[in-house]
């Protein structure tokens, strides 16, 4: 079940302890409304197609061709790819670490979860919005939004990624260690 937890971005007593969340909700409409208030898109779509365990990027994109075409058309996205992570993926640790530090993008970060789950943490103003996305969730993080992503130590997900450029995923890391203080997908 998708979940949103909203925290202040700083501890209460200066001891580095995680502050208590201001909000925790599992209701998709509430998640959508809270994120929309901060200009983040969130939708739930049916992920109606089951993928074979050995599905490659071409198979995944073909299976979800109508959804891909709609998102590309509506958002003007030039490029789309599919990322699929499994608990035995040989690069899982390196890829997890790559996304765990706070960063921004010059373009929107748009992801549709076809399988599994991932944890997006968005650092907006004085809040951190920890958003658990699961199968059927589409999240659109606006360009310039400070955030990080956790796939967990034993990742199991497939997501379609949409880009406004031909280079794909390009990040600018902030150097802020804030991500170390917030919940991960463990």
From Swiss-Prot:
Keywords: Amino-acid biosynthesis, Dioxygenase, Iron, Metal-binding, Methionine biosynthesis, Nickel, Oxidoreductase. It is an enzyme of class 1 (oxidoreductase). The record marks 111 as: Important to generate the dianion. Fe(2+) binds at residues 103, 105, 109, 147. Binds 1 Fe(2+) cation per monomer. Catalyzes 2 different reactions between oxygen and the acireductone 1,2-dihydroxy-3-keto-5-methylthiopentene (DHK-MTPene) depending upon the metal bound in the active site. Fe-containing acireductone dioxygenase (Fe-ARD) produces formate and 2-keto-4-methylthiobutyrate (KMTB), the alpha-ketoacid precursor of methionine in the methionine recycle pathway. Ni-containing acireductone dioxygenase (Ni-ARD) produces methylthiopropionate, carbon monoxide and formate, and does not lie on the methionine recycle pathway. Its EC number is 1.13.11.54, 1.13.11.53. Ni(2+) binds at residues 103, 105, 109, 147. The record marks 102 as: May play a role in metal incorporation in vivo. Pathway: Amino-acid biosynthesis; L-methionine biosynthesis via salvage pathway; L-methionine from S-methyl-5-thio-alpha-D-ribose 1-phosphate: step 5/6. The keyword Iron applies. The record marks 108 as: May play a role in transmitting local conformational changes. Pfam families: ARD. This is Acireductone dioxygenase.
